[in-house]
Amino acid sequence: MEKYRLRRDLPRSGPCPVLLPLSYGLSSSVLLHMVHGQVERLLTKPHPPPGFELHVLIVEPSSISPSNPSHRGAFQLLQQQFPHASFTQLPLHSVFDYVSGLNDILAEYVGPAFVDDTSLPSKERLDAFRASITSATSAADVDSVLLNRLIIAFARSLGCLGIIWGDSDDRLAAKTLANVSKGRGSSLTWQVSDGTSPFGLEFSFPLRDLFTAELQSYANFFPELLNIIIPDGPLSDNILTKNLSIDQLMMRYVSSQGAKYPGVMSNVTRTVNKLESSRMITDGLRCALCDTFICNPEGRQTMDLEERPTNHFCYACERSRPGLS
């Protein structure tokens, strides 16, 4: 957060808006408490530095998964307890409002098995699209992509310079293992590491060196946080792994093994943070679904427009398409 407080490599005057996505989980709730406390301390100084504007986006948990509680009462609590931040709550299906042309992208991604009826409400359209994906891993992967695109598009709509993510060391380790397994290894330089993302926004992970147990100890000191946080349910051993996505499997693995070997999980995230973006030729093409650059391993020149399909999908998104996953 020093980067934003001291305006390193950022405009020296005017507002410096940043976005914090809040899931009501332990990590993002603790991060909000910490960052808001920093804003409060800056404002108490006789001549405070410009600092930054804190915007918080909550994507309704129940719109991501029906098994998640709606937690509606928490939104009012947040506004009362963190007055120096602005809060917005959106359902996941509002991604249609923020990402232009998404209906055509989803229709081509799924293929003829899915027909997008634009006359239906956005929620029903998204439900129909998600129902057309039968693989647990593919469904979780696409949900994650749509969630990221909504958050990034919302940040851009506010003119934010960066996004601060509330991922703990455990979460980043699980995300690293899952993304490599899904073919999204090239995205680790911005999905897990601090720095500039392919979307022109600075991504920061201030909690990258803290374990979940440490964050829980912090939250226990502040009762107001306990009224906001949705606790994670206990991991059940009596469950079929074939019904779990790769993301869920890796999170379960890190949660169980991280308690025994915390140093190993720390090494995973620290090593990934040293990676640099690929210098492979991209031709400037972006994946239609996840909006990241598509690498051109053969170093070919850009194809003529008439030779290109309507939309391009990266390797990972191609793998998760129905019929291939």
From Swiss-Prot:
Record localization: Cytoplasm
Keywords, ordered alphabetically: Cytoplasm, tRNA processing
CC annotations in GO: cytosol
InterPro entries: CTU2, Rossmann-like_a/b/a_fold
Record has tRNA processing as a keyword: yes
Pathway: tRNA modification; 5-methoxycarbonylmethyl-2-thiouridine-tRNA biosynthesis
One GO BP: tRNA wobble position uridine thiolation
Gene3D superfamilies per UniProt: HUPs (3.40.50.620)
Gene Ontology molecular function, alphabetical: nucleotidyltransferase activity; sulfurtransferase activity; tRNA binding
Role: Plays a central role in 2-thiolation of mcm(5)S(2)U at tRNA wobble positions of tRNA(Lys), tRNA(Glu) and tRNA(Gln). May act by forming a heterodimer with ncs6 that ligates sulfur from thiocarboxylated urm1 onto the uridine of tRNAs at wobble position. Prior mcm(5) tRNA modification by the elongator complex is required for 2-thiolation. May also be involved in protein urmylation.
Entry's family note: Belongs to the CTU2/NCS2 family.
UniProt-recorded name of the protein: Cytoplasmic tRNA 2-thiolation protein 2
Source organism of the structure: Emericella nidulans (strain FGSC A4 / ATCC 38163 / CBS 112.46 / NRRL 194 / M139) (Aspergillus nidulans)
